[in-house]
Amino acid sequence: MKNKYSLLLLVTSFGIISCQEKVEPIENEKTVVEDNVIVYEEYMGDEPTAPEETEFYEPKVAVVKPGSIGAAPSDAIVLFNGTNLDNWISSNDSTAAKWHLNKDASMTVNDKTGNIQTKQNFGDVQLHIEWKSPLPVQLEGQHRANSGIFLNGMYEVQVLDQNDNPTYVNGQVGSIYKQHVPLAMASVPTGEWNTYEIIYHAPEFNADGGKIKSGDITVIHNGVLVQDHVELKGTTPYIGWPKNPAHGKGPLLLQDHGDDSRVSFRNIWVREL
């Protein structure tokens, strides 16, 4: 009997780390639904009577060394560490990213220069990103320190200065824009650094471009669960319904909202899942 566990979750003070090494699926492990009741074939037959019969030692679980608080783990792809914007390009024309590089190892939206995105494309990922809304506070509602983090370049986790700033709840900080209201508003005071830990699984499409499996996303905002494995019903447009264009891997995109948002980002890394 083989080990049925293919995922190890390491809980750290700054996020969730899962082993990158994928384990081959177990051929004889199946779930059967009979009359709307789930039955696990692997647990049918004679039940074990000794503890050793349900203890497994293979396959070995990959070792990932977590970083210190604020640092990337050993198998992460570091997308921004504050030294340059080499991993990023303009979403408008694929030229060099034009956002401001700051002395504190952060970058800030350069108003009206356009969104930026990673040169590398990704599918399923664990994403760590830190962001800050600026002082002094200016404007209100959706115009106050508005940005967004787009998985696959099309599914937005909202970034917004929500402190004493009411707006529509499916567009507030921590929302999956216009799809899922966050479970809590967990922002730190304006001018301090927020952390997002995002677990994203991309949708799947058949050969004809039809969606056969929805994507899903989990978001932890400053240690607080705000999106719990929610279904991505499609893209996250400002106007209209979600759309489901067939796609493969895509970039991570950061939004220039075009209204002097002055949002800053730092310490961005991903782990491919």
Regions found by a protein language model. Give the residues of each.
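Carbohydrate-interacting regions of secretory-pathway proteins
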Residues: 19-273
